[in-house]
Amino acid sequence: MANLYNAEGYFSPTEHEAFTRIEKEERAAAKAAAFRPIVYICSPYAGDVERNTENARRYSRFAVEQHCVPITPHIYFTQFMNDNIPDERDIAIFMNWVLMSKCAELWVFGTIISKGMQAEIDRAKRKHMRIRYFTEEMEECK
């Protein structure tokens, strides 16, 4: 903490002000470094489920490496819900929307946009979310 008096004991408001600003900037930088936005991972699931699940894991890991918290519902919900049962799929889609509402951004991976992905993209647009597009190799499309 900055002291109002210098090392020799004299009143030094300028020095105090400078050190106070430096400390404030250091606290802000530390807080910013600790912040990790939540991002919704949008990628194919149906079709080649095994390959698409592995890709979703890679995309989630990529988000972590980019200092984000990934939300990848098609990895999580498929552990206890059956995508082939229409009622369960509808419930899962609803839960996807709930999770998406907590996210700062939607990250879309790959060149093939499935029907489910398009629904997620459309919803993100309606909610004015930032949408970022990436290749399967995790390079951002500009």
Give residue spans per PLM region.
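Catalytic phosphate/metal-binding cores of nucleic-acid and nucleotide-processing enzymes, i.e., regions
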Residues: 1-142
